[in-house]
Amino acid sequence: MSQTLSFVLKTHSVRKDFVHSVKVTLARRRDLQYLYNKLARTMRAEACPSCSSYDVCPNCTSSDIPDNGSSTTSIPSWEDVTKTSTYSLLLSEDTSDELCPDDLVNVAAHIRKALSTQAHPANTEMCKEQLTSLLVMAEAMLPQRSRASIPLHQQHQAARLEWREKFFSKPLDFLLERIGVSKDILQITAIWKIILEKACYCKSYGEQWFCAAKQKLREMRTFESDTLKPLVGAFIDGLRFMTVDNPNPMGFLPKLIGLVKPLNLAMIIDNHENTLSGWVVTLTAIMELYNITECTIDVITSLVTGFYDKISKATKFFSQVKALFTGFRSEDVANSFWYMAAAILCYLITGLIPNNGRFSKIKACLSGATTLVSGIIATQKLAAMFATWNSESIVNELSARTVAISELNNPTTTSDTDSVERLLELAKILHEEIKVHTLNPIMQSYNPILRNLMSTLDGVITSCNKRKAIARKRQVPVCYILTGPPGCGKTTAAQALAKKLSDQEPSVINLDVDHHDTYTGNEVCIIDEFDSSDKVDYANFVIGMVNSAPMVLNCDMLENKGKLFTSKYIIMTSNSETPVKPSSKRAGAFYRRVTIIDVTNPLVESHKRARPGTSVPRSCYKKNFSHLSLAKRGAECWCKEYVLDPKGLQHQTIKAPPPTFLNIDSLAQTMKQDFVLKNMAFEAEDGCSEHRYGFICQQSEVETVRRLLNAIRARLNATFTVCVGPEASHSIGCTAHVLTPDEPFNGRRFIVSRCNEASLAALEGNCVQSALGVCMSNKDLTHLCHFIRGKIVNDSVRLDELPANQHVVTVNSVFDLAWALRRHLTLTGQFQAIRAAYDVLTVPDKVPAMLRHWMDETSFSDEHVVTQFVTPGGVVILESCGGARIWALGHNVIRAGGVTATPTGGCVRLVGLSAQTLPWSEIFRELFTLLGRIWSSIKVSTLVLTALGMYASRFRPKSEAKGKTKSKIGPYRGRGVALTDDEYDEWREHNANRKLDLSVEDFLMLRHRAALGADDADAVKFRSWWNSRTRPGDGFEDVTVIGKGGVKHEKIRTSTLRAVDRGYDVSFAEESGPGTKFHKNAIGSVTDVCGEHKGYCVHMGHGVYASVAHVVKGDSYFLGERIFDVKTNGEFCCFRSTKILPSAAPFFSGKPTRDPWGSPVATEWKPKAYTTTSGKIVGCFATTSTETHPGDCGLPYIDDNGRVTGLHTGSGGPKTPSAKLVVPYIHIDMKNKSVTPQKYDETKPNISYKGLVCKQLDEIRIIPKGTRLHVSPAHVDDFEECSHQPASLGSGDPRCPKSLTAIVVDSLKPYCDRVEGPPHDVLHRVQKMLIDHLSGFVPMNISSETSMLSAFHKLNHDTSCGPYLGGRKKDHMVNGEPDKQLLDLLSSKWKLATQGIALPHEYTIGLKDELRPIEKVQEGKRRMIWGCDVGVATVCAAAFKGVSDAITANHQYGPIQVGINMDSPSVEVLYQRIKSAAKVFAVDYSKWDSTQSPRVSAASIDILRYFSDRSPIVDSAANTLKSPPIAIFNGVAVKVASGLPSGMPLTSVINSLNHCMYVGCAILQSLEARQIPVTWNLFSSFDMMTYGDDGVYMFPTMFASVSDQIFGNLSAYGLKPTRVDKSVGAIESIDPESVVFLKRTITRTPNGIRGLLDRSSIIRQFFYIKGENSDDWKTPPKTIDPTSRGQQLWNACLYASQHGVEFYNKVLKLAMRAVEYEGLHLKPPSYSSALEHYNSQFNGVEARSDQINMSDVTALHCDVFEV
């Protein structure tokens, strides 16, 4: 950049053209200014976040600098700024001085003004791009704490934050691609910050982020070095080879012909065939011709693995070409040739097509290029300009990375130690990269900028080191206190002692001051008179110093913040014998950490006694400190006589040991020893290390084994180190330990079986195993001898240390280097070899640094390979085995000695007993190694022979097929046999079904024999297969098989299973049953004594079975056992059996609606006598569409709730197959004792209670009174302004005198009215459609839970236990498990459920404590709470929780939205679904729960049962939920006739399924009323979203045209559809841009698609608060939980931020008032902060613990909202 500015300012002609171009551009901008400002207001929502970097910035505000650039009170004028040294350094190449930060800020301020005001004088000297670049670099070069003074800094930060929100969730490949193509420096900075942030937290995001960050920080987009220079270099080398090295080009022609072999090549091409075998033959011949067969086979694997990586980048080329052509604008070009030449030159140098702004510069330089000479001169000027642009792009890239790293150096961003360590490593990498650029001669003019960037990174590195030190355990210092009378020489002795402990000057701390900026951190610290001040808590200060935990010193200066105490030795002095009193609570901790030295000076004491009042002479002090008496006290001696009492009671009871007298030298030595002992730590030894090898021998053989290992190391030039004993020394490779059998060792052990001096001769034969007598594989031996730990680069070379070469490669081109490196690398590492080869060839003088960077990120293979590369810059020797060592020399050195010897283990390792000690992995490894060697020797010949066989097969006679089989399925036909398409399908299907491999001829022959009626086994099986293949695709039959093993229920398929046709399906056109028997797990076969089937029976539970009399008369058996205790009532009978079926069916006296196979039943259900073949039978006449047969008697007929109401007992025969005779269910008492306790007793008489027909109970459970909702202290006077109040409290409430009992009775009365719902046939057709629709994403046969406790733990433990047990579930839990009372209740219900018996369906009734609208409070309306029995809830959770979870997990794809989080991107999916509809209807329903038809609820439960397994638990749960609910309150039990209790298990899912079927039935009836037959699945032709009673219907035009009739049908079903806002009027389509669903308004906001919570719901959060239960709700609660209340108000602020700043300011005042009056420790967030937090939580960037991912409860902390 500095070269560009110098070029512009110093070259008059160029400057004149340049300024003219700028003026023209500015004039055009002024003409378009008005239009731009007008459009900016309307397009602000979609504006680029980096708009602050352009000419007219919408984010900019007015500046204090005048338009003419004159001075202000704090900023000098533009004329004065241009005279500063900083400005001169920016425009010159002087690199001796640093840039002044203050002057840099002033320059940036004027540049900002120049960007916003065209009148500023800077616009006449520099263009917009230069001004913007200077401003960006000014921000990067300043330290982070000084950037706030730069203009536009906050706008830049805001822009980067917006980019961060847009790109944070993008994958790594997308971000890296954006860095490569983006021209926006703010966007690039934000992307770098995202990459580096995720790299710091790679534990959460993946290790690939950290690896990619390290790699990309070392890379720079230098197109000139990467592409242009190698291209030019290759051209020069080729030209030199053709001219200088080969002066006679024609002499090269014979060599070229001999190399190409054109005649052989032509013959191969002539014989080529365009078939698979032809290509194999041709390619193999070409590989043989040029002798590249082996290397081609080795390379194919690498090419295939990299193929998919290239495909993934195919779209990048298209996007770049598109951006190139769409970014151009028209230019008036006088000479297009030179114009395009300049553009091509710019691309070759910078790697980028020049943008529109730089095209104007090119045009200005080429305006006078009208001749050849002037064109060449202009091109030279442009080349210099392009080189400067290339350097500028590097500086801008480095600036962006520096800003990103410096902004991550924040405790709120990088919070843990791991992230700080990774940030430190990344900062060091970038620092090293910038340092490399400072050494580049081309970048010398940018050294001031680069040095400032390095200074910024130095600050980051220092800060990270401080943060790491704070969190790291430190060495515990040694603290000695010199006590004694004043004047004895303690301070002087402390100084002398410090010099003996360390060569550094001691640090000095004064505890009388409260900050310690003067502390230097040296090894010794002296604190003189540490206890002189009573105001200082010196005891705790000393305890903090002598500690392993880091101690942060209190410092006043900003740069010293975070300074740690790091001294190793602490010397303190004191005049007190007891610095800390023993009675102090910190005395024990203090004296445990310090050692006290009692210092006395006998000469001084005698002088003071002899001559009191005279000064002490110097003769009393000696230089060697022999005048001092140093007495070291014992541990924890608080004075000379006593030791601290461990119990802290009597401190004068334990005598101190005698002191130890020392001199100054021995004291220093003692302190050093104490420091070493104090910091010794016991560390757990690692497990078996794979790099440690132990050779176990006898003690007498240790020296011999050591000599053998050293001989092996010298013979093989190995890298391991020989150690005697388990202790290891430093080694670059493995360590070989010579051990005795008794020594412990964590490594791999090998037993030495032979060991003598004569074995040294065996090494010449290279048989290491025979020499040592150990059993080792070749791989282990190679690993021992040649493994290299890490990557090592040796810049200095000793010839005796170089390994012997295995390969010598002369590098003439980049391909030579890459091809040789492949031997050293794994498959992943081979792709990085090409990059390294480019670096080596382009910059040969930087070979060690580049190879070091490359080696750090490269994975080397485990094979030992040594290669010597002879390059133009010198010789490089690379040795690899796990790791790598590299020697880079500037001259040619060839190591003599041939090929390195490969260690082998000998041929006897698997013979005899040696194999017994090898693990199987080693044996198989040897086998695979042997197979690999065999393959390597035959792979070429195998390929050649295969190709030769294919070539020979060309001349084999072939049969031709005719017709459509020709060239179609020829490979599948036999010799001379052609199949039609149908025959081909038959052949394939027959082989697949019968698991055969018949040829075509055998299949045709078998089919022919079967058609002729052959009776052999194969022909009979074929005819059976053919008949089953021709049957319908959906035929199957359920059968009961009775055998020796018992009774089995199996499904026998009568046809092959075929795919479902999703098109026209006639099964939806009319009602039909499912084809399977209801309650099949409860149905058994009744047989006679011979086992012949007579009829069926149905299990009622506990071994009681129901059947018909003519089936069980005589000797009847069930499951091979005679039945007993037979009781009859007419034709209906019951009996007992000890054989119990796995499930039971519920019975009920009522009218059936379904026959045993699910078909509808038409009957008047009036019993009368009918004449049958078995005599007169009293039964009911019915008609169905199912044909029955003899033996079907006893099968159940059911009602809408799945209860058995009658048994099949006869039919009309072949003449009238639809006529059926059904025996009604009659109660027969078969109970020996009560089966299960229940509240509702059928035997008790009915009573009337306040208009309800009910049963009286023995106990009375009253309805809870009072409320926990109170007025907030902040709104005692104005709570009436709120639209909601706590619900009515009963008869004593002045707002509504209605009693709680009356409220419950009024709420229950609608449940007692019968609601019919949709017609039977319509309902079951829609049920089939919904099942078919859900089958697309809900799996079948979801297993039920088999563990009772596991099912119980799936429940919400904050809810009621139901009518049989008082309190909530968590009240009956101990240590997370149920107590005995709850466990007994669960066990009794679970036992019945495992037998398939339905449980009592009873609920306890309460009233919900909540806020209600004031008008509803005055009317006395409260919502009921149905408390379900905990046993029923557990059984239902076990049966259907898996199905429910499968449905809710796919809410994005289906109509049911249970489980959706309206504060997440899921709301965007809802918005897209709504927008795609032709018409949208939002519907709510009044009194939804009480208007539900039992038949619809039973159909929904059957849907859940359809997707679950067929276990008894599922039968029990389904039968229980289908039975009528019973409400229990105030000592009465009411059996309701309709409705769906709100506390029913899985109520949200069942309600949603009901909703879907209601809407489907209404649509079906509306269409068929218009003579439109519905033969398709309705749910595939429209979309809907439902959550209980909330619904949004997205109708196509056809459905919308009959919407009035649809809603009319819903009303006819008993429902009460209303508008969402409860207003009166017909339901009409709404605007899809603002749809209300789940009390949320789904709309587009400036932040994206959001679900806005109702404003009144947010505001009433601040008026009421939860507290103790009371009737006085107008009085604030006595205690307030500040945590939950603070979280509630915080979330309310976040929700309010989505409604805009005006509404948020209103909420903010309420929040501040609540904080003040309620005493909360909460600071309400500002609008921008609340908006940022909500958006972060919405996008998943910032998680919160109170997030509720379900919309049936509010996402705020408190449940005050009306749901």
From Swiss-Prot:
Residues 1073-1229 form the Peptidase C24 domain. The modification Phosphothreonine is found at residue 1040. The active site is at 1110 (for 3clpro activity), 1131 (for 3clpro activity), 1193 (for 3clpro activity). It comes from the Viruses. The modification O-(5'-phospho-RNA)-tyrosine is found at residue 984. Its EC number is 3.6.1.15, 2.7.7.48, 3.4.22.66. One of its GO terms (molecular function) is RNA binding. Residues 1478-1603 form the RdRp catalytic domain. ATP binds at residues 484-491. Residues 458-614 form the SF3 helicase domain. Keywords: ATP-binding, Covalent protein-RNA linkage, Eukaryotic host gene expression shutoff by virus, Eukaryotic host translation shutoff by virus, Host endoplasmic reticulum, Host gene expression shutoff by virus, Host membrane, Host-virus interaction, Hydrolase, Membrane, Nucleotide-binding, Nucleotidyltransferase, Phosphoprotein, Protease, RNA-directed RNA polymerase, Thiol protease, Transferase, Viral RNA replication. The record marks 46-47, 331-332, 685-686, 960-961, 1071-1072 as: Cleavage. Changing residue 1093 to A: No effect on protease activity in vitro. The modification Phosphoserine is found at residue 1067. Changing residue 1193 to A: Complete loss of protease activity in vitro. One of its GO terms (cellular component) is membrane. GO terms for biological process: DNA-templated transcription; proteolysis; symbiont-mediated suppression of host gene expression; viral RNA genome replication. This is Genome polyprotein.
